[in-house]
Each structure stands twice: as C-alpha cells, then as structure tokens.
Amino acid sequence: MKPLLDVLVILDALEKEGSFAAASAKLFKTPSALSYTIHRLESDLNIQLLDRSGHRARFTPSGQMLLEKGREVLHIARELEIRAVKLQQGWEHTLRLA
C-alpha cells in the first residue's frame, strides 16, 4: 500500500522537525495535508497516533511504535530501491570469501 509509505515519511518528518509547520515545509506540503493524511490512517486503523491535546502534537505509544517500525520499513524500501537501480545498471552482488 503506497500511501502507507507516504504516511511513514510524514510521521518521520513530524518527529524530526517537531511540528506540522516544519514537517510540511520539509516535505513541500501544507500542514493541513499532513494532518489529513495522518488522520485518515488513524481512521483506517482505528487507532490514535498523535495526542493533539497540548500545544504540540505528541506521539501516543501506538504512534511511537508505528514511527519506530515505520523507520525500519522506510530504510528497507530505500535499500530495495537502491539495489534495484544498481542491478538495472549492471552492478552485481559482491561475494566475500573468508
């Protein structure tokens, strides 16, 4: 599900940047677009990812877990993309003999 990767990128930026405004500037999207995307995932999964009761949104335990595991998924997705490009360009895997 591609939109899930988009949400993971948004959650990562939100945690790193500290606010919807800063995350939206980094991702070249509006704060309302980020908020809507996160809210839609919360509705789809029937969980709350962010506690919005204070001045700044904070990750709930579920949100923190999704952020941490999501970062692993993003890392693997980036690695997969890099490997696919290298393979297409003729790079081969290396074999190490000990």
Please report, for each region that a protein language model flagged, where it lies by residue:
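Residue cluster at the C-terminal edge of the helix-turn-helix DNA-binding motif
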Residues: 17, 26, 40-48
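Interdomain hinge and pocket-entrance segments immediately C-terminal to HTH DNA-binding domains
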Residues: 85-98
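Short helix-boundary/capping micro-motifs
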Residues: 12-28
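A short LG(V/I)-centered, amphipathic sequence patch enriched
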Residues: 42-61
